[in-house]
Structure formats: structure tokens, C-alpha cells
């Protein structure tokens, strides 16, 4: 039995938006294949996340403000910098399933759940998306808490506030 859950660096997108993006990605998969990476998929997936962090040093500045950690990530050949069309489609499909009305039916309502996000995380829409998810989970009567880490982006465990985050968890 699961004793608790920590959901970090997430957000919420309405199903109709996910459906539109999924259709676009399906068309891209038909053209280039499931495993292909393209500028189109990059822009649809994470390409817009850097907008609020200009001037950009890298295409992944949205991950964290800690430049040393970001450089380490960018120089790591095992880290894939671009998402394939197929993986992005699967991610969107999973996000869509998380938004279904029956998603939380079988959850243990007593199990503690912590939503945690950086206030500058574009995945959580700079707290708007994670706040929406929190309200949705609260309506389902889940034992939910939310923590927003200030001056932090997506990768909370590599930010200057990492120790604070770890202690909170």
C-alpha cells in the first residue's frame, strides 16, 4: 500500500487544449515517425518555456536558475534535450487521463499528497496550473497540501533552495 505521494513540478491543462495538441502531434508522428524529434514538437512541448527567462543562456533555462547545475545538465550526453513526437504524445495522453473526472475515485482519501512547485516553473504556469490541480484534488476530498517554493523554477532539487525543498519533503 502506498503511504503517501509527492507530486513535483506539475501543472494542469484543460482537456480541450490537450486534445488539440494531441491531434497536431499525431499528424507530426504520421509525417516523421514516433521516435523523431522536430522543431515543431520542441516548440509545442517545452519550446515556449524559456520566454520568461530572457536573455536565455541555453534552451533549457526554464529548468533551473542554478547555472552550474544547468551547464552540467546541458553537457550530459545521457540527458535528452529534445522530446520525441511519440513521447510527447504519450505525455499528453497521460495528462489527459489525470484530468478525467474518475481519476481519483480509487485513491485512498486519507493518503497524504504533497504538490510542490517553484513559483517560476512554467510547467505549473508560474503557480496557476498547480493551483488549479490543487483545487481539483481538494474537491475530490483528497488529503492534499501544496507548497510553492519562491525564486525556483522546474527542477527544485537543483535550485539554490534545494535544501529547503528537501527538508520540506
Which sequence ranges carry the predicted segments?
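Active-site nucleophile elbow and catalytic-triad environment of alpha/beta-hydrolase enzymes
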Residues: 83-105
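Conserved alpha/beta-hydrolase "acid-adjacent" motif
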Residues: 122-132
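Post-His helix in hydrolase/transferase enzymes
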Residues: 128-129, 152, 157-169
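Catalytic histidine neighborhood in serine/cysteine hydrolases
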Residues: 73, 134-155
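Acidic beta-to-alpha connecting loop that harbors the catalytic carboxylate
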Residues: 119-122, 152-153
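Alpha/beta-hydrolase-fold enzymes
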Residues: 1-78
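Short beta-strand/loop motif that positions the catalytic acidic residue
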Residues: 115-117
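Soluble, non-transmembrane catalytic domains of enzymes that act on hydrophobic metabolites at membranes
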Residues: 1-12, 75, 103-104, 132, ...
Amino acid at each position: 500500500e502506498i503511504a503517501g505521494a509527492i507530486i513535483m513540478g506539475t501543472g494542469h491543462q484543460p482537456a480541450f487544449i490537450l486534445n488539440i495538441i494531441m491531434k497536431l502531434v499525431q499528424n507530426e508522428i504520421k509525417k516523421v515517425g514516433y521516435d523523431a524529434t522536430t522543431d515543431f514538437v520542441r516548440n509545442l512541448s517545452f519550446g515556449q518555456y524559456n520566454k520568461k527567462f530572457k536573455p536565455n543562456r541555453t534552451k533549457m533555462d526554464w529548468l533551473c536558475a542554478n547555472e552550474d547545475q544547468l551547464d552540467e545538465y546541458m553537457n550530459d550526453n545521457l540527458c535528452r534535450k529534445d522530446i520525441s513526437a511519440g513521447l510527447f504524445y504519450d505525455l499528453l495522453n497521460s495528462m489527459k487521463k489525470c484530468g478525467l473526472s474518475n481519476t481519483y475515485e480509487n485513491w485512498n482519501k486519507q493518503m497524504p499528497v504533497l504538490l510542490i512547485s517553484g513559483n517560476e516553473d512554467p510547467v505549473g504556469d508560474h503557480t496557476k496550473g498547480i493551483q488549479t490541480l490543487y483545487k481539483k484534488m481538494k474537491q475530490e476530498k483528497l488529503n492534499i497540501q501544496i507548497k510553492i517554493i519562491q525564486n525556483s523554477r522546474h527542477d527544485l532539487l537543483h535550485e539554490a533552495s534545494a535544501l529547503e525543498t528537501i527538508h520540506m519533503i
